[in-house]
Amino acid sequence: MSVRNSRPQLSWPERVSPQRTIDTPTASGEMLTRRQSAPALVVPPEETTHVVVVKRQSPDAAAAGELVPSRRKDSVAVQSGIVATGPLDTTRSGARDDFLMALLECPVCFGYIMPPIMQCPRGHLICSTCRSKLTICPVCRVFMTNIRSLAMEKVASKLIFPCKHSHFGCRARLSYAEKTKHEEDCECRPYFCPYPDDKCSWQGPLRDVYQHLMSSHENVITMEGNDIIFLATNVNLEGALDWTMVQSCHGRHFLLSLEKINLGEDCQQYFTACRMIGSMKDAAEFVYNISLEAYNRTLRWQSKPRSIRENFSSFTNADFLVLNKHTVELFSEDGNLALNVVIRKVEERTN
């Protein structure tokens, strides 16, 4: 016969008896009623369970990414192969960091304020980007000054921030020194339409950019191969014009563009660009060559392709082939300009 262990009895504080009053005479003979204090109910502080993220092998773990119990009662282990991207919100330090990051929200753009952190004379914080556009504080309406909050800059240097593209799926958590660089080329950052006329407002993930070009910009054609001829027709027509096509090679898509810009009367320039439909990191793995040949003349250009992250309107400040009207006339035949484009992958150097 098995004997069932009785459950331990819970100890509750004794029931507080009804309050009794005690009459105390005063110096003048009046009777004052004094209320007897009831016994205080002491609630023990709730124990805080710390969560420690470790990386170890578990021979009997079910699958990758499964949480497996550690030997310590107050810790949780993560199976090897999963890297934690930031502190867990259930820890005390996570709650503290969330509170501090909430203090660093810009009241104008609602983004996190990164150093240099500006403040108004009354101490309200604002990011440097919004500060350059405002003359009065958006909170208290006093005139802004160029006062930096050095204390909050030190606080920001100790915090780990989420990527601003977290609502698109990015799970990276970074220091403020790494945050800006990561967000410029974040894989989850939406891409804008790379067509050079800047009239298309489409944006979406990288995997949909090429399909968008084919479906929404019918004049864009695709040529296969790493060595092609990009033919721009009627380059002598008046006005601002552009010619665009896609070159597919090395398992990638490259957007070739020739844009004619009027800078003034009788002053026209042609900007030739090769941009990769991909990230800036991927674009750095390739090199392209553009050559023009006509009437025993040869012009060659070599550079690295840019990513479509960069706006086409920034061509004048970028590293692209620029031709003036006279040069185009020298290399064009019957008003058509033929550009030989060769794209190759950069070979890794061996030590």
UniProtKB/Swiss-Prot annotation:
InterPro entries: 7-in-absentia-prot_TRAF-dom (IPR018121), SINA-like_animal (IPR004162), Sina-like_RING (IPR049548), TRAF-like (IPR008974), Znf_RING (IPR001841), Znf_RING/FYVE/PHD (IPR013083), Znf_SIAH (IPR013010). GO terms for biological process: proteasomal protein catabolic process; proteasome-mediated ubiquitin-dependent protein catabolic process; protein ubiquitination; regulation of R7 cell differentiation; sensory organ development. Disruption phenotype: Flies are viable. In combination with a mutation in ebi, flies show an extra dorsal central bristle phenotype. Flies that lack both sina and sinah show visible eye and bristle phenotypes, which can be explained by an inability to degrade the neuronal repressor, Tramtrack. Zn(2+) 2 binds at C193, C200, H212, H217. Residues 155-346 are annotated as: SBD. Signal peptide: none annotated. It comes from Drosophila melanogaster. This is Probable E3 ubiquitin-protein ligase sinah. Interacts with ebi and phyl. A zinc finger (RING-type) spans 106-141. CDD domains: Sina. Keywords: Metal-binding, Transferase, Ubl conjugation pathway, Zinc, Zinc-finger. Residues 18-27 have a biased composition (Polar residues). E3 ubiquitin-protein ligase that mediates ubiquitination and subsequent proteasomal degradation of target proteins. The adapter phyl is required to direct the degradation of the two isoforms of the transcriptional repressor Tramtrack (Ttk). E3 ubiquitin ligases accept ubiquitin from an E2 ubiquitin-conjugating enzyme in the form of a thioester and then directly transfers the ubiquitin to targeted substrates. It probably triggers the ubiquitin-mediated degradation of different substrates. GO terms for cellular component: cytoplasm; nucleus. GO terms for molecular function: ubiquitin conjugating enzyme binding; ubiquitin protein ligase activity; ubiquitin-protein transferase activity; zinc ion binding. Belongs to the SINA (Seven in absentia) family.
